[in-house]
């Protein structure tokens, strides 16, 4: 049984992330594991905090969530860990062989600091499974009706095609394949066209609806977000890192920009070796 791990800090943003995770779990017949991480070093805490009372309060809140979402999906449970937020959530995902991690990007109790500035991509880059990040304060429909799949000239850009197709099949989504022409060189432009054609063939094989478009792009984060706004997207799928080429603008900082600034949920996929499309 596939499982979704959700980072919980009891903020509204983490509850919003939980709602999105439950929608996916229900559609895909998956289970949900909520994870709360106690990141406080009590020996250095200037306030008198009783860790036992703190853990009791957390367990009580989880019990309320279990009651609220009872029967909403295949199964829902919770895990309490001690340590660094990002590393513990990733460890739980590995231990449970999770399908994905879902987190809100501007929560409290550790997430807010964690997601700020240059640290925005840490949980995404540390995870071995896809990470769905959902920015707080934006009202995005949870059903994945329209998914944006941006493709550039790098080989690894295609590795997000299978998980996109799988999610699309659960929701009967329409995938918008966005060919990002970042160079005027004909060989690079041809390569992107070939990658888009491969994605089209894959989606045809999997009976996934799709639309293909090409745009000339100098700033792929802004251009992708502009396109997502235009089609009223529910999800953008990106890679966490890519090869370094003269045409590649989607380096780590750009993935971080997307995660931190996208008003749309972003699924970040870590490249793997020896994948066959």
Placement of each model-derived feature along the sequence:
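Charged helix-capping and loop-helix junction motifs
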Residues: 116-119, 191-196, 250-255
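Local beta-strand N-terminus motif with an aromatic residue
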Residues: 1, 97-99, 120, 129, ...
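Short, ordered loop/turn segments at secondary-structure junctions
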Residues: 37, 106, 136-138, 180, ...
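Small/aliphatic-rich secondary-structure junction motif
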Residues: 1-52, 146-213, 233-235, 261, ...
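Structural beta-alpha unit
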Residues: 50, 67-101, 205-236, 241-250, ...
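Helix-enriched interaction subdomains in cytosolic or periplasmic regions
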Residues: 101-128
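Short beta-strand elements of ligand-binding domains
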Residues: 102-105, 130-136, 266-270
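Short glycine-rich, flexible loops that bind phosphorylated cofactors or substrates
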Residues: 13, 109-110, 156, 244-246
